[in-house]
Every structure is written in C-alpha cells, then in structure tokens.
C-alpha cells in the first residue's frame, strides 16, 4: 500500500509560500539570497483566509409587515369572526351519560374559548399598529345605572354640607375618637369574642357588658362619659348578626347586618396586632348616602395614623356590601415590593337603615331604609 500523504497545516503552507517568494539582497556563500528587511518571525495570521461569519438566526429587531388593503380587511374580518361565541349544546354530547354532559360541554366551551383567544392574539401580532383596541370587560360595576346623588368633589353644596354636618367636629380636629362597645343582654361567648376583636381593631375603645338596660339609657350614659361613638352588637342563634353605629352626641344612627364573619384564629395565616394607630382606607363610596356612611366609619379612628406600625384598616364598598379587612403591610428587600399580613377579623356589612339623630325606635326619623322587593329591582342599581 502506498504511504499516506501527510496533510500540511495552513501555517506550514504559508511558510513555504513565504520562502519561495523572490527577495532582493546579497547572496551569501551557500548561494542563498539575503533579504534586506527579513522579519525575524513570520506572522502567519496575515496570510490566513478570512473566516466565514456565522449566520445570525435570531433577529434583534422584527421587521414590520407591509399589509395591503385587502389583507388588512381580511384580517380584521377574521378578528371579528373569532369573537363569536360557540354554538355547542348538550345535544352534541348525547353519546355520554346525562351526568357527564354538563362537564363535557363546559370543557369543550372552555377549550374553544382559549383557541379563539389565541387566534385573536396571533391576528393582533400580524396587524401590528393597525390592530383594533382591546375592549374593556363589561362588569356590573361598569354598567351601573345612573344615580343623581353621585358626589362630585368640586361641588360647593357638598362641601357646605360637610362643613356643617354632625361629623364636622371630628374632621375639624375639635374632638378625638372615644368608642364604647356593648352588646345585647345575655350575650353568648361568640358575641363577646367579636366585641374583643373590634376592640383590637379600634383604638381608644372600651367594652361594657350590658344587662337589662335600655339602649336610650346607654346612650345618655355614653354622652356623660364623653364617648364620641357607640357600637352595639346584636346576635341571633348565638352568633353576631348585626351592629348599630351611633355617632354621639347628635347622631346619626345606622344599622348594619353582619355576614361572612371570620375570627382571627380561623384564618389560615395571621399576625399579632399592635397598639399603633392604623391607617384607614375607604373605597368606592360614591353617592351622598355612601359619603355619609364613609364619614361615619372614619370617625371611629384617630386622626393621625402611626406609619411605623404599618397597620391598615380597609372598608371596601362593592355592590353595597362593605368588606372589612385588617392588615399589616411588610416591605421586602430593597423596598421594591410589599406583602400584606392579615391581622383579622374579617366580615362584611350591609346597610339596612340610617336614622337621623340618636337611636329612637318609636319617634326616630329615618333618612334611608332598604326595602328589598321595592328597591332592588335591578342588579345594576346601587345606593352607596
């Protein structure tokens, strides 16, 4: 077998080419020409062929597609067609048992909805700047019926009423909150527990056990002791089911029904409350009635919160249900994020009536009373 020829490297070939080039200079004794300016070392990198550049697969900037009028119209029609709802019914799943048809229909509708959403997203990417704007989701709150009593912050009449109403001394810092908490006669342990939870949330509050004493008598005693607010917790079937808010000394008085009560110990994760004055957040009280209720709730808490405690008490109104939450916010590293730790309790209030002045069941003047069958004729009608 013939011996294999050794492959020469690029460096060796460049050296041979360099020696074979004609150079000018004197010839030495051995017959070799001497170059005048021969370099000591040969740089082979100069004679190497240039390396091929790698093709870039991922482009940093996406090229904008130039859409013709016909293509644009076709994509827009396709986008609108993808909004159509599915036409599948239970009759399409007759081959399944009756107990499984409902779940199968929901599963198919959900799958079809996801597919149409993905199709619309793809069309929006193709359209680019020509894509139509996303529609705002329709909710009961966004479709709320018009109410003539909606409060405008720049309304002079509202400002005049607030400057002369029963809560003006509190907002003018003429008085500081002092709250009395009591309950119905012969209250059970659960009601007492709820009163202690309220005392934990409301600073400067005191609990008084109530025996067979009339509520009017309690109001007069609270005035003599210079209390600014009175809370009376009612119970039904050994559980709290309502609460009376009475602002002293001139009222007004409101009655709320209590729903979805969860004590602190029943929460999955909770923290210990501190004695710092909390911040108060009042959300979504938009009408004149809602504005008065919000001012009544604000009067329960001191004016200047202590931000070092990071306590927050929230009254969030949604569809005339007032959700109560008690949190402490905690900052994460570098202060870029914050987390909420619930301190409890958790409950929901529903306004039943509002009475002018202090509580008077016989001769009291009611400003507003909830009559469900007469007033709740539409799901989109709210009063707070």
From Swiss-Prot:
Stretches of Basic residues bias are at 96-114
Known SUPFAM superfamilies for this protein?
Class II aaRS ABD-related (SSF52954)
Q: Where is this region: Disordered?
A: 1-58, 82-135
Bias class Acidic residues marks the residues at: 18-48
Q: Where is the composition biased (Basic and acidic residues)?
A: 115-127
* InterPro entries registered for this protein in UniProt: Brix (IPR007109), IMP4/RPF1 (IPR044281)
Q: Which domain of life is it from?
A: Eukaryota
Which PROSITE patterns does the record match to this protein? BRIX (PS50833)
This entry carries the following GO cellular component terms, namely: nucleolus; preribosome, large subunit precursor
Q: Name one Pfam family in it.
A: Brix
Residue span, Brix domain: 177-360
Q: Which PANTHER family match?
A: RIBOSOME PRODUCTION FACTOR 1 (PTHR22734:SF3), U3 SMALL NUCLEOLAR RIBONUCLEOPROTEIN PROTEIN IMP4 (PTHR22734)
Stated name of the protein: Brix domain-containing protein F44G4.1
